[in-house]
Amino acid sequence: MNEASRWRHALAQQLAPHYSANPKVMAVSLGGSVSLGCADRFSDIDLMVFWTAPPTEKERREIIKRARGRRGPRLPSKAEEGYWLEQFEVAGVVIDVRHVTVETTERIPVDVLERADPSLAKQQHLAALLSALPLSNPSVLTHWQHQAATYPYELSVAMIREHLLFHPAWEQEMLAERSDLLVLYESFCTVEQHILLVLMGLNRLYYSGFRWIDRLMGQMHIIPPNLAPRFKQVFGIASIDPLAGVYQLHELVQETFVLVETHVAAVDTRQARAWFQERRKHWEYVPDRLL
């Protein structure tokens, strides 16, 4: 754990008792870059608070007050799904809190692990649990981490089928030839995200977001060679020669197809390949007998 993570961890340990003092709170944990040990000067502190019954607005507000925090902007929450988000500051340090019911926390592994639900939001919850550090009642977190530790083959197949989806190659070639760079770069991001999602399924890693992707790729064993630098090179090459950047990215797509075909026989790539390789007819001149 680096120094930026250590002092944030210490502050989180000071904040946790304000939550665990409430009898409805079963456990408190620390997540994000701090629990991973790679926080930097921009990092906030991510807390997860697990409630046996939904917290009231008053309860959450009073905890922040006891912690001498200054409440931040109202964040989107979904009470019907069993979670509430909020943000506050302590001495200028931003604290992001995800309040979640125990019922929700115990339902998500059933959906993802037993029913192979590839929902990214649910996987993100499991990824957060696996990387979390306990701040109170550690046995509860350990139990959930043990549940989430085994990534099932069926989920791997579901993830690959869901995200092995690339628009026809000619679309990016068209954007490159037109020097329509804003849309082209946006499409680069979309394709790279889909590659990563497929690779997460191949490597049986829960989706945890698209931050710290070099760290994510470092956890993968089934991966195109030199993926991290090649991802970055796509944009660098395209800034000089857009079409060359497109071809570099398309090589990665083709290599991803090969990896799926090699390691997951249950996934039929033929339809996805055919769509990616589809070509549109070009018209340099007016077609014969059209006009």
Task: Give a label for each model feature.
Residues 31-68, 80, 88, 92-99:
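Catalytic metal-binding acidic patch
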Residues 35, 102, 206-207:
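Short, solvent-exposed loop/turn segments at secondary-structure junctions
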Residues 3-4, 66-178:
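Conserved NTP/Mg2+-binding pocket subregion across the NTase superfamily
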Residues 15, 19, 64-71, 256, ...:
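Hydrophobic, Leu/Ile/Phe/Ala-enriched alpha-helical segments that form helix-helix packing faces
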Residues 40-42, 108-111, 212-213:
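Short aromatic-enriched loop/helix-cap "lid" or pocket-rim segments at secondary-structure transitions
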Residues 14-16, 31-36, 72-74, 83-85:
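Short secondary-structure capping/turn segments at boundaries of alpha-helices and beta-strands
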Residues 142-291:
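Conserved nucleotidyltransferase catalytic core and NTase-mimicking acidic/glycine-rich helix/loop elements
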Residues 1-29:
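Helical scaffold of the NTase/Pol beta-like nucleotidyltransferase catalytic core
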